[in-house]
């Protein structure tokens, strides 16, 4: 993840950046353990000459592999964060060394125990680094299968209690390693929707933090407590609980399943473009986040991924499997996660994605950010006259008055204006803007004739829903989990599993019908159909129509700014205000016994 927030002046935990999977800065270089391991052995176990040559070589080889693995792992942080080719060979070498190291310590455990003094927490460190490698590889490739591999190694550390003896040693830096392991494990579990494991880990982490701060006079207690608060808020962000008959919570997955996207009708002619790259940008003030991943970013991330499959056959017996250099088929679009990026950071990653975009492919830009509104008056209506969304600033505004006066005649610098995206419309571009100033992107101009669609959130919500904004945007929730969003606007906070599954089945029917409305429309802009061949984009489009139709029928959504918009505009009478779709929404409301909060005949009420 890109961490533009490092320059942010908002108070935040210094520990949080290390939770995103980014490689930590290595400590000051020390002499190799190889140089003095045998001398230590002599002093504790007899003369050096008494050590068999084979065992001496085993320790030497292990120390070499350990030092080499650390060197390669620390080098990961120097790799460019953008681009998809520069880093693959380095990752291959790193995986190769860790494969040898892991197998070597398994095969020679007794010798290493006796001659090297190998401790269980050191084995845990190796396993933790391997888990981090798989997590890094997931961030680089967006292949969710590698998350399962990271989970495999992190689980083994916990199940085998590799870190259990750390608390008995008077070394706070070892305890911090253990705490960071927990934090990374929680991130992986969140991404895999293993919420039951997350809750157990949070409890264990809380106990570990309490013990750590009690035993050592530390200065980071507040920061670790902030980590706990962040993850607690994150796992409670969903506004609706699905319950089993015994009142246990059902964990729902929002990744694309095999039958998730509505199928195209036989013979239907749509574009053959495929989603290849996505920039997911989060810069909302005060939104719940964990490990530099806001709730909105998390939800959009999952909306652009397929259900993961295991790479290894045995999850509880971790064995390293090196990622293939050339996967036969990319399951998921490649993604960059940018948390509070500066304008230059955002533009750098955008340019890298644009440069490497394959032929017949689409670049998606998702913006979840605070709106920036134009200051002063403007005689024109150009792409820099409507404001945009906020980008992060590198420094404090020292002279606020001077900045304010300058802004009366100049455009806001720390803002992504619609005009900033014009150069990238030379290739197919799909934009989703979730912001209080999303309408700034409504007046796009398609200069180059390439497919271009913008899905724009409402700029305001009814007062009853405004207090929930910290838990994520309603618009993004509709794109990620439309049924949960529908339940939320209907005032429902929990539901039995059986009813949930019944509603999901009906919603799949609604999505199929929406797909037909779009493909059968005679007046729809062809840009929408150009993107319709891709499963991810097709699902986003049908969910957008469902979201817009629901809000237009809901009695609480009465202002124009409460409705989503798009560029190009959709033909309302054939899509979001289609009587057939409105009937479906009323039927869904009837199943949930909330029909009274929707207009029976919305067309007559406008």
UniProtKB/Swiss-Prot annotation:
The chain residues annotated with the modification Phosphotyrosine are 64
User: Which Gene Ontology cellular component terms are annotated?
Assistant: cytoplasm; nuclear membrane; nucleoplasm; nucleus
Residue span of region Necessary to inhibit MRTFA-induced SRF transcriptional activity: 1-212
Query: Which spans does this entry mark as compositional bias, Polar residues?
Result: 1-12
Region: Required for interaction with MRTFA, residue numbers: 71-173
Pfam families for this protein: SCAI
Question: How does the record say this protein sits in the membrane?
Answer: Single-pass membrane protein
Q: Which GO terms describe its biological process?
A: DNA-templated transcription; negative regulation of cell migration; negative regulation of Rho protein signal transduction
The terms under GO molecular function for this entry are: transcription corepressor activity
What keywords were assigned to this record?
Answer: Cytoplasm, Membrane, Nucleus, Phosphoprotein, Repressor, Signal transduction inhibitor, Transcription, Transcription regulation, Transmembrane, Transmembrane helix
The source's domain of life comes to Eukaryota
- TM stretches of this protein: 472-492
Region Disordered: start and end of each range? 1-53
Functional summary from the UniProt entry:
Tumor suppressor which functions to suppress MRTFA-induced SRF transcriptional activity. May function in the RHOA-DIAPH1 signal transduction pathway and regulate cell migration through transcriptional regulation of ITGB1.
Regarding protein family, the annotation reads: Belongs to the SCAI family.
Whom does it interact with, and what assembly results?
A: Interacts with DIAPH1. Forms a nuclear ternary complex with MRTFA and SRF.
Protein name, UniProt field: Protein SCAI
